[in-house]
Amino acid sequence: SSGWNRVLAYQYLDFHRQMYEEDVPSPYLIRSYISDKSDYEMIYKSTEAEDSSFFFNVTMQNHSGYAQGWYNLPRHIELPNNLKAADRTAEQFLDLMKESDLALEELIGYYSQCEEPTLVVFFGDHQPPLTNAFYEELYGKKLSERTTQEVLQQYAVPFFIWANYDIEERQDVVISPNFLGVLTAQTAGLPLTGYMEFLAELYEVMPAITPVGFVTADGQYLKKSELSQEQQ
């Protein structure tokens, strides 16, 4: 796909090698997309063949929309009637999440048995495009009535950093994507560039900077209009 100027952006990332759908032999599909399981199997093969490597891996299994049929996707999730009526595609998304969990469990299990030191950084890129009615059922109120904290939490996605060797353990880390590369480098013990050092200092003041709001070091959830002059 060429959306978001990917064709040019991927070149600027300057990876030694790029792999796409056509590079996966006999992939296991879920719906019409390559499954997380097949995706991870390509990584296993690559890391077995190379002494060291860095992957930026984007999976497609759970891409919207969620009314594409159930090919190779077992039905496990049944929502309450009010949520089902608000968005009849939500169950498919949640079943896809279950398949992702199973593949992720396999990924972590695989690298936990490897002698080569391995660091996995896992994060989602955005919330699923379910209907506003679905989210309003979850909140029990109109989306227009959400607090800044609720808006930010709706857009939040899970992430973790895992290693098959000892690293500092942290829980409930608040961070926006612009800082994640810095945290990864710090966790891996890699040197920071000057720009990354700037981001590391900024993170101590404002750990989440997003288009829909900000989180301060003392845990305040603020709109842009609520930022102090110093924060701006």
Residues covered by each model-derived region:
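Solvent-exposed soluble domains appended to multi-pass membrane proteins
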Residues: 1-232
